[in-house]
């Protein structure tokens, strides 16, 4: 683990049939425009153009996705943990509710850092340590995931994990064909 990119890891842990089920269930509901949080003003706003759609998951969807997320996070911790009396073992114990993302033609996720505050509601407390992106399909063009200006190729069922801090700026490029379905969560 000598290079900063060593902490960007992809594991394929979501069954393809579960990915399809999640897409089908989400498309029976109403999507909303993504909003960016401005920590200075305390406001949430969407960009005027090219903003992707988002949707919270249901408790049932979260329960069905949990085994895949837990398996990926366990593997991540085994790979990136440093040996030592106080550094080994499990250091991630929870992850936030999933938020589904939908990038249709002409939309994107602009480059940003994951300095997420909104996942903590006063009852759930912690510091986001690992950003999680789950890829639910791959029958689209464009919508490439870039982290630190490098493309990370994702297949159906992949879970991408990386540290949730300013050293990992990331984005999803504009979708040019089809629709990209994914989800995000943060582990702490």
Predicted region positions:
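Fe(II)/2-oxoglutarate oxygenase catalytic core
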Residues: 1-159, 167-188
